[in-house]
Amino acid sequence: MALDAGLTRTLRELVLGRSVAALGTLHSNEPFVSMVPYALYGEERQFLIHVSALASHTRDMLAQPRVSLLITAPEGGDIAPQALPRLSVQGDALRLNRAGTDYAPARACYLAHFADAAQMFELADFSLFVIRPVSLRFVAGYGKAFSPTPATLALILGSRN
C-alpha cells in the first residue's frame, strides 16, 4: 500500500504539528527512553535536538549514536490509543561542533522553534545533536503501516527550516 494524499497529509501534520518526541537510546546496554523537543533542520529534514550533558540520553548518544525517535498524535477524541498516528525514526545522532559551519544555522533553526531555549545555549553542558534518519515506520491507524524512505519524508515535510 502506498502513501496517498490523505496519508501524506496525516504524516506531514503529525511531524510538523508536534514539538516533542520520545528518544530511545541504549544506556548500559539497556533500553532507555526520554522526551526531547525537536526541530526539523536542513534540506534532508533531519531532527535537531538540544540536550544537556547531565542527561543520560546525551551520554548514551555519545557512546552509541544509533537512536530512535517516536512521534505520536495526541490522545483524545474518538481514536483508540492503538490507532493513533505515529512515526518511529531510527537514525544516527551526531553532536554538532560549536566551531563547525553547521552550528550557527542549526542553532538559529532550533531557536526559531524554541525561543525560550536561548539561555540554555549559554550553558557549556548543552549540545546540539542532529539525528539523521536511516529508516522510518509510519503507522496511520489500524492496518495502515508504511516504511517511507528518509528522502520521501523530506519531500513530504518540505524544505523549509
Regions found by a protein language model. Name each.
Residues 52, 72, 141-142:
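Surface loops and adjacent helix of pleckstrin homology
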Residues 56-113, 126, 133:
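Short, structured beta-strand-loop surface elements
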Residues 4-9, 108-109, 113-161:
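C-terminal edge-of-domain segments
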Residues 44-46, 66, 135:
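Structural motif
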Residues 25, 35-36, 58, 76-80, ...:
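Catalytic micro-motifs at enzyme active sites that drive phosphoryl/nucleotidyl and oxygen chemistry
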Residues 22, 33-37, 88-90, 128-130, ...:
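Conserved hydrophobic/aromatic beta-strand scaffold that supports enzyme active sites
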